[in-house]
């Protein structure tokens, strides 16, 4: 099988010849920039300063030569813009924890006077910063820049501003990226923009110059109970924008794309869902179903959702809402036992992730512990297809290279490639 055939088989719940593998194939399966640099050195690849895909996570593009070494079966059409409204077309050097990396040329980074850094929406430093990396930190945290929400002046269009209206420039960018990677035979995944129905990463409006509306994460998660009509109008209009964006991408790319990343909104914590299954079913699921139903009726694409945490109680409604795949499969969270997940929902949804614990085992375990957990997870999740191997979310800063290599070698061992 080609990589593309392998991934399609997994999404059709057929047993592929090997377990498909993803590193850098979607926005939440990335690799920290410094770790990526060290991985390239380990495999003897040409030195290139890591090119930052998104400054909030400080993850870097996985280029084709490294993807070959890692055995990747998925190719991401990397985002046109990042969390802070930086455009990923032109680049400049910046020092990140002593290492040279490439960041978008319109990014403006300023010292905070305490060893950390600020970034600004669309690189406009005449405005308050929208992101902050603390001293000795590795990531930029989004900053809330708006006053407390005034319900007397509530206008749902203020939060609808977050949703991505696809532009001709964005489509042209992705066509250029696709032309460079189309010969790889990897499955192609794309996320055309933000359609997240309240993704905490986007609620503060880090890419917007003058965000309005409900911008405090705490206020947002109370809003469904306090201002249900406001939230429903935001979701209704956001869903219409999403479907129009999907239509534009189908017209531009058709079946050259295999997987559509719809949404990165988290609904789980380490200890379980942070809302009741009934709230998810009644408020969120109808809009997700509308998006997924359009995709399945009008395209050949499979759909993918990211959702961290212990989400076992709401997985039935994600399935009913039409998602084909779920990432990152956080098996370290409460209620997310791998075997129970596979036995209960393995025929209904593709598990994309869950391959190794990135909170404890991968960063702090011994290589043999990493190998053992990877082989155990592969044995459980790979049965009858329906699985794409990946770590649980991005590979974090300071993860030992020997542990990452142990993980990759274990996957190759399981697949008969080593």
Annotated model-derived regions:
Residues 1-40, 45-53, 140-418:
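Active-site loop segments of alpha/beta catalytic cores
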Residues 59-76:
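Catalytic domains of carbohydrate-active enzymes, especially glycoside hydrolases
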Residues 77-92, 192-197:
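Short, glycine/charge-rich beta-strand/loop segments that flank catalytic centers
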Residues 75-78, 186:
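Short secondary-structure capping/junction motifs at helix and strand boundaries
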Residues 28-30, 86, 124-131, 197-198:
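Short, surface-exposed beta-strand/loop "edge" segments at domain boundaries and coil↔beta transitions
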Residues 94-173:
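A gly/proline- and charged-residue-enriched helix-loop-helix capping module
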Residues 72, 79-82, 122-124:
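Beta-hairpin (beta-strand-turn-beta-strand) motif
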Residues 2, 71, 94-98, 266:
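Residue-level detector of functionally special positions within alpha-helical transmembrane segments
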